[in-house]
């Protein structure tokens, strides 16, 4: 059996990507970091994206923070998801930054959200705060595309939220809007403002917003897969 090592180039097929992701299952983050020659931080307070970066290294991801998918040649996006001991998501999942201007003519079919969620490699990771970061284990991966019903749910929420943005109501949107998709501020500090449309159609400055999948959506998705896999 060959020794486990990070992919130095992007995987050439979904099968190779999934095979590599499956090999990581059961390892701790500390073990994977040590084998990849990178330091494990004490916690994620200042390194929020560290787990994603670690898995990108192991899986040969290419996109970084660019708008295309992490595995652009395959059209696959990588999403790590912290879960509790029962495999339930512990937080919402960031999808992409929301465009607050220039949205005339935009449709669900051509949206960034749909593009990012067309094909996703979900990698659950132990997220219980009581487990030291280095000791948290990587779970079994799932390669997923939205079902017709999931696509419909996402589209309805996206259309409602985009209508509010276009109509100058971005400041009225709360995390409670949307059944499975929410829009909320995404900024490291409250001084990072971006242009948006105000209630009277005037340009305003507001916090950047991001689209996030709600926990009920990802929980149902993971439960369906892993319950089918482990009857």
Swiss-Prot record:
Any GO molecular function: DNA binding
Classification via SMART domains: MutH
InterPro entries cross-referenced by the UniProt entry: DNA_mismatch_repair_MutH (IPR004230), DNA_rep_MutH/RE_typeII_Sau3AI (IPR011337), DNA_rep_MutH/T2_RE_sf (IPR037057), Restrct_endonuc-II-like (IPR011335)
DNA repair found in the keyword field: yes
Domain of life: Bacteria
Localization of this protein: Cytoplasm
Broad class of where this protein is predominantly found: cytoplasm
Keyword field contains Translocase: no
Keyword terms: Cytoplasm, DNA damage, DNA repair, Endonuclease, Hydrolase, Nuclease
GO biological process, one term: DNA modification
GO annotation, cellular component aspect: cytoplasm
Pfam families: MutH
Annotated function: Sequence-specific endonuclease that cleaves unmethylated GATC sequences. It is involved in DNA mismatch repair.
Protein family according to the UniProt entry: Belongs to the MutH family.
Protein name, entry field: DNA mismatch repair protein MutH
Organism in which the protein naturally occurs: Salmonella paratyphi C (strain RKS4594)
Gene: mutH
């Amino acid at each position: 059996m060959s020794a486990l090592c990070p992919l130095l180039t992007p995987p050439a097929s979904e099968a190779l990507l999934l095979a590599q992701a499956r090999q990581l299952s059961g390892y701790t983050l500390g073990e994977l970091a040590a084998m990849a020659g990178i330091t494990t931080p004490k916690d994620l307070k200042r390194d929020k994206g560290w787990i994603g970066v670690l898995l990108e290294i192991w899986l040969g991801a290419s996109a970084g923070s660019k708008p295309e998918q992490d595995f652009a040649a395959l059209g696959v996006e990588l999403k790590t998801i912290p879960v509790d001991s029962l495999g339930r998501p512990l937080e919402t999942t960031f999808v992409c930054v929301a465009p607050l201007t220039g949205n005339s003519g935009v449709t669900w079919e051509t949206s960034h959200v749909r593009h990012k969620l067309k094909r996703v490699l979900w990698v659950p990771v132990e997220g219980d705060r009581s487990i030291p970061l280095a000791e948290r284990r990587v779970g079994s991966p799932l390669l997923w595309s939205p079902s017709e019903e999931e696509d419909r749910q996402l589209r309805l929420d996206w259309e409602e939220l985009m209508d509010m943005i276009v109509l100058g109501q971005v400041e009225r949107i709360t995390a409670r809007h949307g059944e499975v998709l929410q829009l909320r501020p995404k900024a490291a500090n409250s001084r990072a403002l971006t242009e948006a449309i105000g209630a009277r159609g005037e340009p305003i400055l507001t916090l950047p917003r991001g689209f996030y999948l709600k926990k009920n959506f990802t929980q149902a998705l993971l439960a369906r897969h892993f319950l089918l896999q482990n009857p």
